[in-house]
């Protein structure tokens, strides 16, 4: 099992036979990890658990004592044209300049009329936004926000990922939201679960501790994979001199990285891996030594003039993530490569209501990860199918957010691990199963 993020931990958790779980880092969790400094706790931006699968909910809740998990109703806002709107934008236009509201409603009506005439389904993400919500809503939210998130990849983005993650209100909700009847609670993430002690790393650490009591599950940290020999069904690890045989190999490392470790991969597989694209991430952890005006958990910021596209207040979800009277923020930056204009960021946070005064800031830490979002372009579907199909023919299941090269959440990763364990059981000899 390659990678001890949530997918890898879940695979080991559900495994029916002996499993060796290896992780390159010095701790488990993958992107579901936390850092702590001076009484503040920061995740890798917002990691809120949205639980719908009953078995996964039972797994998570079983790791914590009563009172150690909080169920929280989402408080999310959108900052547009100087107004702080409830989420989602398309169902809460009230508060925007009247000309913008009119443009959005007229565009929505025109889009519905086109749909009634049987207009073809769009294939691009921008086309989806314009077709489903109209040109105005697309122009004032979906295009500018996603331009900041996806950068240069937006124009190539398909609509393959939108069905679950973008709320689609009906006409009554859109009209109601435009005249001031707030339409909240829409979307897949209207409620979330989070450790009351602060820090999403409590989840993978609880799983690690539970797995430590299972003789059939071995965890090796600080261990990377050098090479996979698919002919001999063996793997070379950085911490071991000898090749390690495998009956079934489950990998959660980024899909292109796995293929690069397989010298025997055919040209078509290598080409498919080379065609995959991703978005890297840069954000700021901001420790504030005073209360902040914001009462929301996170806010989307489509305004092009502001240097960030999403801001969250950790301590509004779990007060333990900051010292008493303080607040902890995450600020997701639009620019992923250039110098950070911190005064501009802090001024924008004041405008947003996430900060009262820049002088309240105790410290700021800039952080980044290479793999954040996979890009759903025209090559994605066929390339992914080629890769996953070939790998399974070699007794390799590549899964999870980056192993499966998909857009998903933490619960999905836990489900993917459960499914991978079921798959692996078909490759492990019966006498070796627990």
Task: Identify the function of each model-found stretch.
Residues 14-37:
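Glycine-rich FAD pyrophosphate-binding loop
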Residues 1-21:
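N-terminal Rossmann-like FAD-binding beta1-loop-alpha1 element of flavoenzymes
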Residues 83, 93-94, 100-227, 231, ...:
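Active-site/ligand-binding neighborhood in enzyme catalytic cores
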Residues 7, 27, 256:
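Conserved Rossmann-like nucleotide-cofactor binding loop
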Residues 246-248, 252-397, 403, 408, ...:
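C-terminal segments that line or cap access tunnels to active or ligand-binding sites in enzymes
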Residues 71-73, 219-223, 239, 400:
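Short loop/edge segments at beta-strand edges and connector loops
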Residues 414-430:
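Internal hydrophobic alpha-helix adjacent to the cofactor/substrate pocket in enzyme cavities
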Residues 38-117:
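Dinucleotide-binding Rossmann-like beta1-alpha1 core, especially the glycine-rich loop
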